[in-house]
C-alpha cells in the first residue's frame, strides 16, 4: 500500500509523475483519490472556476486513461444546492459541465431525511428518525452500466463507515416525476 499525500500546491503534472513512479514500483495501476477537485492548482494562473475545473477534469481523465488507473474525485457543490428542499444533482456540482461530460461515473451522496418526499414524513412522525439513519447514493451517471439508480446504506458513523449492505430506495424522493411515460 502506497499513500501519497499532496498539498494544495500539487499540480496535475506532479500527480502524473508520482503516479507513474508508483505504477512502476508496484507493477499495477494505483487508485487515485482527489479531495477535492476544485482545489487542484494549475501551472498557469487565471481563468474562471469553470475553465479551471474543465482543465483539471480533462487532465485527470487523460491521466486515468494513460496509466489505466481509476481516479475518484470529490467535488464541491454550489452553495444554492445545499439549501433545504433541494436535491443535489450533477448540475449542482461546481464546474458541472466538464464533470458531466468527462466522468464515467457520478455518484451523489445525500442524507435520506433531506431528500425523501414529504408524503413519507407528514403521516408518520417517527419516520424522520428512521430516515436519519440512512444515506442515499444516487447514481447520476454511469457510462458503462445502469444510471439513475438510488441505493440506501445505513450510517455507522461511530465506526466511520456505512454498512456494506445497500438496498434500493423504495420511498419516493423529492424532485422525482410522479408519472412517467
PLM feature spans:
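C-terminal regions of RecA-like/P-loop NTPase motor modules
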Residues: 12-32, 59, 65-67, 80-181
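Helical hairpin unit composed of two closely spaced alpha helices linked by a short loop
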Residues: 30-70
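Conserved H-loop
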Residues: 74-76
Amino acid at each position: 500500500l502506497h499513500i501519497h499525500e499532496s498539498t494544495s500546491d500539487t499540480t496535475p503534472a506532479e500527480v502524473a509523475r508520482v503516479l507513474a513512479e508508483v505504477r512502476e514500483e508496484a507493477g499495477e495501476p494505483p487508485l487515485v483519490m482527489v479531495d477535492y477537485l476544485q482545489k487542484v492548482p494549475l501551472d498557469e494562473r487565471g481563468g474562471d472556476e469553470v475553465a479551471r475545473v474543465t482543465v483539471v477534469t480533462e487532465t485527470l481523465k487523460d491521466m486515468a486513461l494513460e496509466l489505466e488507473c481509476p481516479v475518484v474525485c470529490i467535488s464541491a457543490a454550489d452553495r444554492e444546492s445545499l439549501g433545504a428542499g433541494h436535491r443535489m444533482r450533477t448540475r449542482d456540482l461546481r464546474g458541472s459541465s466538464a464533470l458531466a461530460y468527462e466522468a464515467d461515473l457520478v455518484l451523489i451522496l445525500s442524507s435520506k431525511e433531506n431528500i425523501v418526499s414529504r408524503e413519507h414524513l407528514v403521516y408518520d412522525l417517527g419516520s424522520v428518525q428512521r430516515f436519519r439513519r440512512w444515506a442515499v447514493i444516487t447514481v447520476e451517471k454511469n457510462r458503462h452500466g445502469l444510471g439513475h439508480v438510488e441505493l440506501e446504506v445505513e450510517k455507522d458513523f461511530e465506526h466511520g463507515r456505512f454498512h456494506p449492505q445497500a438496498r434500493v430506495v423504495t420511498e419516493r424522493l423529492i424532485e422525482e416525476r410522479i408519472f412517467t411515460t
